[in-house]
């Protein structure tokens, strides 16, 4: 009788783990600053994985650090896509609609 319960727990753990790692999206940005037609993302802007918590050093948009690919989100994820034409310190600028890695 223990075996089915253990199997169920294993399946549930794998399902939760897979769901936590689903890619996400940046859902907000600076309404007045567009990058390739999309609002520029900044620290504090929201994603489906929580807020962006890490941005470019020394580059601010409306008083907030600009978000770039590789920046962290609240749940341990990262921004993983961005502009193909705008770079900050060699990293693509992140924008509303760009992808995140999902939570860790």
What are these regions (language model features)?
Residues 2-104:
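Intrinsically disordered, low-complexity proline/glycine-rich segments
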């Amino acid at each position: 009788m223990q075996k089915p319960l253990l199997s169920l727990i294993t399946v549930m753990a794998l399902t939760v783990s897979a769901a936590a790692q689903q890619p996400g999206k940046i859902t907000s940005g600076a309404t007045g600053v567009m990058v390739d037609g999309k609002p520029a993302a900044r620290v504090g802007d929201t994603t489906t994985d929580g807020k962006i918590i890490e941005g470019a050093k020394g580059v601010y948009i409306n008083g907030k650090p600009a978000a770039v690919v590789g920046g962290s989100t609240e749940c341990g994820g990262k921004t993983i896509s961005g502009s193909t034409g705008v770079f900050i310190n060699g990293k693509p600028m992140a924008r509303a609609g760009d992808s995140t890695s999902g939570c860790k």
